[in-house]
């Protein structure tokens, strides 16, 4: 049993659970600090280390969740004690980086800060040597405060605010994107020394979130834009594209790389020697990543082989953040539905002798302390479908057990899960069945909650968008990089 030492800072909304657990890791994991950036990590070693790391991660996350929820009595706790909270495993971010280096060794990741600008996450990625894709002055400021060199930042926002352009010029952040003539003239006026990436239009029809309606120059317009850039004396250094967030069609990368190759040839005709291709984001953290990476890697090897000297970068966001964060929510209210109607306290036919509601064929609406206006906003705009699992019910903690999961048994109880606001659309789950009876004070947890969650939470209805994060680290390499 691995025992944690807890260092907490509730006022700063940060807890860190530090584990002394190097003995449970394989040599692959303890050596990976030295091999992650030199390309010597082998596939079999990675898989062996991954399996070990995942097992330890589950134990650590479970311990952190258990310690927190078992210390809270919803009947007597202070306001805020039972609030939603996250557990973040920085070791998962580290494993994802190993996975990236194994599958796309030539492509340097520039983490999309917008996805989840968590300070600890950014610190680890900076230590791993990644770059950063920033879309605003605030994101650039946050990265620069960590001591990251401006050359490791790309201002990947084709339509920029004038004052932000002046700011990045002062800070020496030179790399940025454009996709239209007006933006070129603005840059020529405010930051003529910038290093520019022409963002091209892609087919993002298979993506969860499409960007082509808003950003990207068509191939019909790229030649003219390159000509204008040359006329204005601007320095175009590369091409960028984005196949959409949460892409599902690997061939989208192939077509985009082919189009980028065409633009490289167009640029050469104007005397530009482009040095970088930015393949954007769209990478998921699930099993589809390897398929996407295989197609992209083959396309890059064909159209931009290593001997050409072209630098390759990407802008992954959810790939790094999604699976690293687990969210715990408290059930704050319950409504019993019998035959399609809410059960009234005065309905004696539905009451037991002790005053409790008979289960029978009842369904329940449970209300939790987070919802679509909070960390579940991704349901609305990111097309996500978070799956609830039982963390604690009936005085028992059930994390990662059979009882925690949805059940298809005939006698399983049906629930819908709702957020805390007064808006009728604030529903997290329309229907899910569990074997357990859930009640006020019980806890649910949701995995894969690191992407576009906390960063887009609002304060609608006066509910807080500041939630505690408990950090664990299931990889010694990550702990070493962070000095923990």
UniProtKB/Swiss-Prot annotation:
Signal peptide (UniProt feature, chain positions): none
Record-annotated disulphide pairs: none
Subcellular localization, as worded in the UniProt entry: Cytoplasm
Names of required cofactors: pyridoxal 5'-phosphate
Protein name (record): Ornithine decarboxylase
PROSITE patterns registered for this protein in UniProt: ODR_DC_2_1 (PS00878), ODR_DC_2_2 (PS00879)
Top-level enzyme category: lyase
Binding positions for substrate per the UniProt entry: 381-382, 423
Active site: 422 (proton donor)
Pathway(s) the chain acts in: Amine and polyamine biosynthesis; putrescine biosynthesis via L-ornithine pathway; putrescine from L-ornithine: step 1/1
Family in the record: Belongs to the Orn/Lys/Arg decarboxylase class-II family.
Organism, as annotated: Neurospora crassa (strain ATCC 24698 / 74-OR23-1A / CBS 708.71 / DSM 1257 / FGSC 987)
Gene from which the chain derives: spe-1
BP-aspect Gene Ontology terms: putrescine biosynthetic process from arginine, via ornithine
Organism ancestry: Eukaryota, Fungi, Dikarya, Ascomycota, Pezizomycotina
Keyword Lyase: yes
GO annotation, cellular component aspect: cytoplasm
Main location: cytoplasm
């Amino acid at each position: 049993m691995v025992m944690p030492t807890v260092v907490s800072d509730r006022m700063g909304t940060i807890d860190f659970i530090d584990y002394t657990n190097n003995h449970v890791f394989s040599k692959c994991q303890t050596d990976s600090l030295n091999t992650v950036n030199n390309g010597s990590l082998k596939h079999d070693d990675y898989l062996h280390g991954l399996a070990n790391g995942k097992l330890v991660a589950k134990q650590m996350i479970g311990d952190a969740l258990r310690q927190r929820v078992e210390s809270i009595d919803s009947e007597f706790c202070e306001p805020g004690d039972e609030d939603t909270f996250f557990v973040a495993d920085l070791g998962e971010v580290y494993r994802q980086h190993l996975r990236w280096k194994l599958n796309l060794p030539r492509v340097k990741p520039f983490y999309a800060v917008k996805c989840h600008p968590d300070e600890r996450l950014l610190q680890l990625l900076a230590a791993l040597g990644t770059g950063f894709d920033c879309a605003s002055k605030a994101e650039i400021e946050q990265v620069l405060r960590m001591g990251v060199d401006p050359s490791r930042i790309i201002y990947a926002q084709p339509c920029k605010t004038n004052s932000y352009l002046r700011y990045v010029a002062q800070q020496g952040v030179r790399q940025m994107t454009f996709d239209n003539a007006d933006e070129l003239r603005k840059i020529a006026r405010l930051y003529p020394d910038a290093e520019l990436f022409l963002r091209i239009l892609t087919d993002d029809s298979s993506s969860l979130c499409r960007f082509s309606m808003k950003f990207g120059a068509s191939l019909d317009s790229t030649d003219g834009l390159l000509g204008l850039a040359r006329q204005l004396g601007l320095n175009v250094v590369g091409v960028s594209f984005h196949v959409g967030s949460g892409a599902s069609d690997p061939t989208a990368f192939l077509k985009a790389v082919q189009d980028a190759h065409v633009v490289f040839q167009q640029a050469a005709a104007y005397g530009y020697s482009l040095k970088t291709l930015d393949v954007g984001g769209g990478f998921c953290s699930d099993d589809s990543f390897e398929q996407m990476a295989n197609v992209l890697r083959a396309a890059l090897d064909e159209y931009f082989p290593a001997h050409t000297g072209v630098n390759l970068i990407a802008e992954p966001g959810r790939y790094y953040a999604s699976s690293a964060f687990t969210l715990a929510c408290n059930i704050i209210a319950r409504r019993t539905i019998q035959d399609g109607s809410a059960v009234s306290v005065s309905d004696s036919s539905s009451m037991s002798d002790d005053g409790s509601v008979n289960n029978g064929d009842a369904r329940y609406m449970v209300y939790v302390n987070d919802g679509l206006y909070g960390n579940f906003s991704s349901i609305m705009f990111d097309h996500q479908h978070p799956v609830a699992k039982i963390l604690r019910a009936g005085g028992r903690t059930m994390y990662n057990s059979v009882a925690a999961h949805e059940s298809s048994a005939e006698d399983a109880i049906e629930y819908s899960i709702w957020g805390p606001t007064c808006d009728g659309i604030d529903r997290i789950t329309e229907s899910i069945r569990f074997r357990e009876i859930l009640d006020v004070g019980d806890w649910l947890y949701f995995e894969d909650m690191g992407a576009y969650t906390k960063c887009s939470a609002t304060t609608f209805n006066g509910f807080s968008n500041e939630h505690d994060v408990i950090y664990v680290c299931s990889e010694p390499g990550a702990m070493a990089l962070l000095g923990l």
